[in-house]
A protein has these predicted regions:
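Bacterial N-terminal signal peptides
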Residues: 42-52
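A short beta-strand-turn-helix
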Residues: 72-93, 265-285, 305-310
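N-terminal, post-signal-peptide region of Sec/Tat-exported proteins
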Residues: 74-118
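Conserved redox-active cysteine motifs that mediate thiol-disulfide chemistry
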Residues: 99-111, 289-306
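Thiol-based oxidoreductase modules, predominantly thioredoxin-like and allied folds used
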Residues: 123-148, 163-173, 315-329, 341-352
Length: 407
């Protein structure tokens, strides 16, 4: 197959005529070669500056030590707006930047609650702010959580984990977060009675509580309450990078890559289904039985695609099994492609469904949707005989995987 035209954007105009494809280029630029080159040069320069500007927008500087606490008015999960003035009575104010999805932040939640309990009577207030743009978080970054960073799901986490501190949302504009400059979650900023920044950094020196040797936040609070200088004023911050709005383009590119993945379907006989149920993959296996004519199956299918994209980089796999008849394979594949289901997809190989149903699960009567989660030893640890509760299913998956292999 012949190669495409080659354009050489160097040398003087006449030299271009010697290059293959030059007639096309000549038609585009005419005789004004110098003008064309100048335009091309400024286009390249402009693109470089644009990209540099986008990068700079993501490199938000952290608030310097000694700076005053930036003011804020942000909505809380408790239904009210909170301002900096609401904490005016505190001797010391801790501003914690945290979020739902980050496993590091999750590790610290119980410790933060205990710090609030231990220091509340001493005049210390703590407020948590979620700094991430939810639309700048990729699905695979949700692999260690059941919840995303939306305001609605912040409310769920705060309630389920009984947060004893205000949890505020800044994901729409990130204006407050940009004023403080958290580099990751969790990141704490500690202000004295005059609301001057006295400490910025990590809560302690390890997300694993059994490995903690230095309690930076507690040591800072003790020192400030005693009228002393904190022993440490700044540390590195280990955690999930703050998801500034500029990362939306990365998410878009990621979703386009997922959409381009091939989608196939294979026929499954009784032997295939017995092997599917046995599960010798070494992974947790989520299996969903469905059909194109099943309205609840169709309605919930997007949830399964999302769940697979969240967890597939861990010890997890998702398999769909259509109980449509073999002669309906074309419509099954069309549906799967429309849903971008690039996971493993199977279709009953025979219209004799009862034998195939029994091969997978003799206790299953054949109604769809039917969903099971199988552990690496082949035991069904979660079963749903009707439409799934997406949150409950995510939690079952998370619990099982984290107990087996915590982050």
């Amino acid at each position: 197959m012949p190669n495409g035209p080659e354009f050489v954007l160097a040398g003087d105009g006449p030299a271009l005529e010697k290059q293959r494809g030059a007639p096309v280029l000549a038609a585009l630029i005419g005789n004004d070669y110098d003008g064309f080159m100048k335009s091309w040069f400024w286009l390249v320069v402009g693109s470089v500056f644009l990209l540099a500007g986008l990068r700079a927008a993501e490199n938000i500087p952290a608030l310097p030590l000694g700076a005053s606490a930036p003011d804020f008015t942000l909505p809380g999960v408790d239904g009210r707006d909170w301002t900096l003035k609401d904490f005016s009575g505190a001797k010391v104010l801790v501003v914690l930047f945290t979020c739902n999805h980050c496993p590091t932040a999750q590790y610290y939640e119980e410790r933060v609650k205990q710090i609030v309990t231990d220091y509340k009577s001493k005049g210390v207030s703590l407020v948590a702010i979620m700094p991430n743009d939810p639309n700048s978080v990729r699905l695979d970054e949700l692999g260690w959580t059941d919840l995303n960073d939306s305001f609605a799901e912040m409310k769920i986490r705060a309630k389920d984990h009984q947060f004893n501190f205000p949890y505020l949302y800044d994901g729409d504009t990130e204006t407050v977060s940009r004023a403080y400059g958290p580099v990751a979650t969790p990141h704490v900023f500690v202000f004295d009675a005059q609301r001057k920044l006295r400490y910025a950094g990590a809560i302690d020196d390890s997300e694993r509580v059994q490995h903690v040797k230095k309690h930076y936040l507690r040591e800072t609070l003790n020192a400030l309450l005693a009228g002393k200088e904190p022993p440490t004023t700044q540390t590195k911050v280990v955690g999930c990078s703050t998801k500034w709005a500029g990362k939306q383009e990365q998410v878009k590119a990621y979703m386009e890559k997922l959409a381009a993945e091939p989608v196939t379907v294979a026929r499954a006989d009784a032997e295939t289904l017995r092997a599917l149920r046995k599960n010798d993959s070494g992974k947790f296996r989520l299996v969903n039985f469905w059909a194109t004519w099943c309205a609840p199956c169709v309605a919930e299918f997007d949830e399964f695609v999302t769940i697979n994209r969240m967890y597939r980089h861990r010890d997890f796999e998702f398999v769909t099994v259509s109980i449509n008849r073999p002669d309906e394979e074309k419509s099954v594949l069309e549906f799967l492609k429309k849903k971008q289901a690039s996971n493993r997809n199977l279709l009953f190989a025979s219209s004799e469904r009862e034998a195939l149903i029994n091969a997978f699960d003799p206790d299953w009567q054949g109604a769809v949707p039917y969903t099971v989660l199988i552990n690496p030893e082949g035991k069904i640890i979660h079963r749903e005989l009707d439409s799934i509760d997406p949150l409950a299913l995510k939690r079952a998956i998370q619990k099982a995987m984290n107990e087996r292999k915590p982050w």
